[in-house]
From Swiss-Prot:
It comes from the Eukaryota. GO terms for molecular function: DNA binding. It is a single-pass membrane protein. The gene is MAJIN. Residues 59-150 are annotated as: Disordered. The chain crosses the membrane at residues 152-170. GO terms for biological process: double-strand break repair involved in meiotic recombination; homologous chromosome pairing at meiosis; meiotic attachment of telomere to nuclear envelope; meiotic telomere clustering; oogenesis; spermatogenesis. The keyword Transferase does not apply. GO terms for cellular component: chromosome, telomeric region; nuclear inner membrane. InterPro entries: MAJIN. This is Membrane-anchored junction protein. It comes from Homo sapiens.
Length: 176
C-alpha cells in the first residue's frame, strides 16, 4: 500500500517512543511544513507498523525496555526495529526494584526463621529444666513450595497471563 498525502483538520502533536528515544511530531493543517513547500523536500516513504493501541500496551512497552529477547515469537520484527540511535554512551542499568511480592516473601522467610529458632530455644530450655513432654519432637511448620510453573510464556501473552491466569479456564476437565 503506497503512502498518500493527507492533512489533519486541526493541529496535533504526537509522540513516538522508540527504545530510549522519544520523537515528537507536530502535524499541522495544510500542504506546507513551517511555510516550506513539500514538493522540493525529501519525503520518507517508509511505513511504520504500529501495534493496536490498548491500555496494556504502555505497560508492555515499559516491560520490553528491560528485556533483551523479542516479545512475541510470532511477530519478531515488531520490537527489533530501531528508528534512531542515541547520542549518549551506553546506558547504565538500574538495580532491580524491590517489589511488594519480594518484600512479602522476605518478611515471610524472616518470620519462619524466627519461629523455627523460637521453637528450638523453647525445646532446649524445656530439656534443661526437665519439662520435656513424652513423645517425639514435632519439627516447625514448613510451608510447601509452590508447584512448578507450567511452561512460562514470554512476551505479551506471558504478561497477560501474569496478570490473570487464563489456564484455569482452559483446563481439561476429568468429567468428560
Amino acid at each position: 500500500m503506497s503512502l498518500k498525502p493527507f492533512t489533519y483538520p486541526f493541529p496535533e502533536t504526537r509522540f513516538l517512543h522508540a527504545g530510549p528515544n522519544v520523537y515528537k511530531f507536530k502535524i499541522r493543517y495544510g500542504k506546507s511544513i513551517r511555510g516550506e513547500e513539500i514538493e522540493n523536500k525529501e519525503v520518507i516513504t517508509q511505513e511504520l507498523e504500529v501495534p493496536v493501541e490498548k491500555k496494556a500496551v504502555g505497560a508492555v512497552m515499559r516491560k520490553r525496555k528491560h528485556m533483551d529477547e523479542p516479545s512475541s515469537p510470532s511477530r519478531p520484527g515488531l520490537d527489533r526495529a530501531k528508528i534512531g540511535t542515541s547520542s549518549q554512551g551506553p546506558s547504565k542499568k538500574k538495580p532491580p526494584v524491590e517489589t511488594r511480592r519480594n518484600r512479602e516473601r522476605k518478611t515471610q522467610q524472616g518470620l519462619q526463621e524466627t519461629l523455627a529458632s523460637d521453637i528450638t530455644d523453647v525445646q532446649k530450655q524445656d530439656s534443661e529444666w526437665g519439662h520435656s513432654l513424652p513423645g517425639r519432637i514435632v519439627p516447625p511448620l514448613q510451608h510447601n513450595s509452590p508447584p512448578p510453573k507450567e511452561r512460562a510464556a514470554t512476551g505479551f501473552f506471558g504478561f497477560l497471563s501474569s496478570l490473570f491466569p487464563f489456564r484455569y479456564f482452559f483446563r481439561k476437565s476429568s468429567h468428560s
